[in-house]
UniProtKB/Swiss-Prot annotation:
It comes from Escherichia coli (strain K12). InterPro entries: IAT_beta, IAT_beta_sf, Intimin-Invasin_domain, Intimin/invasin_bac. GO terms for biological process: cell adhesion. Residues 1-25 form the signal peptide. GO terms for cellular component: cell outer membrane. PANTHER family: ATTACHING AND EFFACING PROTEIN HOMOLOG-RELATED (PTHR39576:SF2), ATTACHING AND EFFACING PROTEIN HOMOLOG-RELATED-RELATED (PTHR39576). This is Putative attaching and effacing protein homolog. Keywords: Signal. Belongs to the intimin/invasin family.
Length: 295
């Protein structure tokens, strides 16, 4: 099955009074009416299953007046810069969309943060789709200074496919020295009805994170929408991940991953590069400047 997009090219025009009104109206709505969200967790998948770190569940109290003042100042500054640039229709649309999605990300994450640890990433492209958007939630069922039993779920949109996962895990904390845990999860591809089961283990220290996952398919052959007269199913496999930094130089970090999958034609590198029992090694080096302190 082929996929294609059709659209119309919009004429470009100089910044008009109408565009200015639309921009200011959007900003006013965001300031005066914070986003109200209701959410029913639909927990279910991700190709990667690195569990979110244990974050503080403490509440941060901020007065409504301070939030409004900060929002007004921020929006006014951004709007002033935007209006002075004499933007066209595309710039106006991008500005409005960016401001709206940023506010939505903030409001949803703060609301979900009342119940657990949440990570929200909403993206809206020029077609107003949710491509590369994701929502992850970790909820502690039993939480003490030394042990935590939790459930975690996620849903995300990648490559025109919607995938989800749900899982349970247990972590043991040895003071401030290290953490070890195990987890089990179910991945489900909502777009193609593929399912797999996974188990994992993790070990963390202040400067090092180690994890390993195994994947077992739970669904059979199905017709592939990408290749004519072809069937597909999840591949069994496993991966090992390491992430850390130098204690003496914390701004310099690195990550390393090895993954292995089994099958005659596994598309680890894409549907057009299928291989037998493929494996891959990926590495990344990051540098985070140390923020300056203020007196």
């Amino acid at each position: 099955m082929s996929h294609y997009k059709t659209g119309h090219k919009q004429p470009r025009f100089r910044y008009s009074v109408l565009a200015r009104c639309v921009a200011w109206a959007n900003i006013s709505v965001q300031v005066l009416f914070p986003l109200a969200v209701t959410f029913t967790p639909v927990m279910a998948a991700r190709a990667q299953h690195a569990v979110q770190p244990r974050l503080s569940m403490g509440n941060t109290t901020v007065t409504a007046d301070n939030n409004v003042e900060k929002n007004v100042a921020s929006f006014a500054a951004n709007a002033g810069t935007f209006l002075s640039s004499q933007p066209d229709s595309d710039a106006t649309r991008n500005f409005i969309t960016g401001m709206a999605t940023a506010k939505a990300n903030q409001e949803i994450q703060e609301w979900l943060g009342k119940y657990g640890t949440a990570r929200v990433k909403l993206n809206v492209d020029k077609d107003f789709s949710l491509k590369d958007s994701s929502l992850e939630m970790l909820y502690p069922i039993y939480d003490t200074p030394t042990n935590m039993l939790f459930t975690q779920g996620a849903i995300h949109r990648t490559d025109d496919r919607t995938q989800s996962n749900i899982g349970f895990g247990w972590r043991h904390f040895s003071g401030n020295d290290w953490m070890a845990g195990v987890n089990t999860f179910i991945d489900h591809d909502l777009s193609r009805s593929h399912t797999r089961i996974g188990v994992g283990a993790e070990y963390w220290r202040d400067y090092l994170k180690l994890s390993a996952n195994g994947y077992i398919r739970a669904s059979g052959w199905k017709k592939s929408p990408d290749i004519e007269d072809y069937q597909e199913r999840p591949a069994n496999g496993w991966d090992i991940r390491a992430e850390g930094y130098l204690p003496a130089w914390p701004q310099l970090g690195a990550s390393l991953m090895y993954e292995q999958y089994y099958g005659d034609e596994v598309g680890l590198f894409g549907k057009d590069k299928r291989q037998k029992d493929p494996h891959a090694i990926s590495a990344e080096v990051t540098y985070t400047p140390v923020p300056l302190t203020q007196q």
